[in-house]
Amino acid sequence: MEHRTYTQPLVHAEDTLALSGSVLTVGAFDGVHSGHQALIGTAMRSARNLGIPSVVYTFDPPPKALLCGARPLTSVRDKVGKIGALGPDHIVVARFDAAYRARTADDFIREISRLAPRIIWIGADFRFGSCKGGNPQMLARYFDTRIFPAVCCEAGEVVSSSRIRSLREAGRFTEAERLEGWPVRHTLQRTSDNGGRHVGA
């Protein structure tokens, strides 16, 4: 995957971007680790195949920071910079505060409808709306929703922000950096555009 220099015009606040078609991926993307990179890369390839923009929708702060007190792995500036280096056409950063947390799942669906997503790529554990009322199955009632499989490390463990955070807290920085995966590895660049599954399939 070709990296490009991140530029400010790529970034939008929630409810400010409207498109006539897109491929969308949504997530906290805390740390933009190797699993996130693979997911975003797959969404970008889907967009290129369809000839429409790719959009990465993320949150500041990551929801777990507000809901569970988890310390973010990166600042929003660093996160947006890393996502921008992967090369999507647009980045939407939603301010995850008490007001956003109170929004319903239907509110979220109405918002992302403005992006006219032809395909939405998400992780299997993605939830949205107040009290996590929305899930992939609900999203699939409105959009072509595809689940990206978890990325595992060589030891077989799933790469996750929580795992990286635990490694950092234990002082195991080399292991954490390996899971973070910067720079993006060639093996992740080759992830198939068909690597996910349709919700309900």
Residue positions per predicted region:
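Active-site cores that bind ATP or allylic diphosphates and position pyrophosphate for catalysis
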Residues: 94-99, 106-201
